């Protein structure tokens, strides 16, 4: 129905927007942006926010709608200055919400990638559904997570990695986050964290817990000229998994290509999900120290795989990156970075640097 996609010229209202969503119609250009602006400025009521969040998820959001939501959220965010660090940094983050309560694979992978010499600009938060999110675990390791924009940029410039704690950088999101917590079910807002990194890095390994929405996220990154791998473990993880295959939406030069990825092709043994399960922040911090200290096993394998994925995404910023050679190089670099002690040293340097600020 072509008329559904016509530009809507009427001034948006909540009844008109919720009316479209609850009858399964896509929003007109600018309507999602209007709704998000109402939410971010505190104008929308909790009932309007909840209705919008749930109805949008049930309709299934389009990439155009989610792009508008993310762009408005970034407009209200505290920006990280990129004049020193540029935007050819990489983020490693997932939507969360996979219910698996794994150890913090993306946090460990981020440290490995930074130690391999690729600047990491990580966006993250405390746990929503698991016992310990990336922010909780970094705090337990001694990394200060409450840094402001200039301090985070300095951390990337000096150490090679910075962490943007979502609460610090998206103060206007507080209206939505309270509603999101009360609802307790995934909504369209779950997609926004990985799409609203305040430093706008151009590369990323982005996990999505919902296969049907991963392609929507990939479409947003494609519109930004990013080099990103949006990944969904076929066991449901919002990471590249080692228990089975993963589906990858490879975003490069404005296009999206869907691939099935089998780590066994690169020599990885199949793991059991139980081997990747984490605990509270102290438990997960101990797991980080063990893996960076050289401990072998399923967690290390998953960390190496995800670190390599981020290195592949970053390599994709140059147009001549070939898929299989990039993976082989990424896996070798990630392994060497752990085995040489470089990743362990980088974490110690990061802790020292942030504690001095």
Curated annotation (Swiss-Prot):
Mg(2+) 1 binds at residues 106, 239. Anthranilate 2 binds at residue 180. Pathway: Amino-acid biosynthesis; L-tryptophan biosynthesis; L-tryptophan from chorismate: step 2/5. Anthranilate 1 binds at residues 94, 125. One of its GO terms (molecular function) is magnesium ion binding. Mg(2+) 2 binds at residues 238-239. Binds 2 magnesium ions per monomer. The keyword Transferase applies. This is Anthranilate phosphoribosyltransferase. It comes from Mycobacterium sp. (strain KMS).
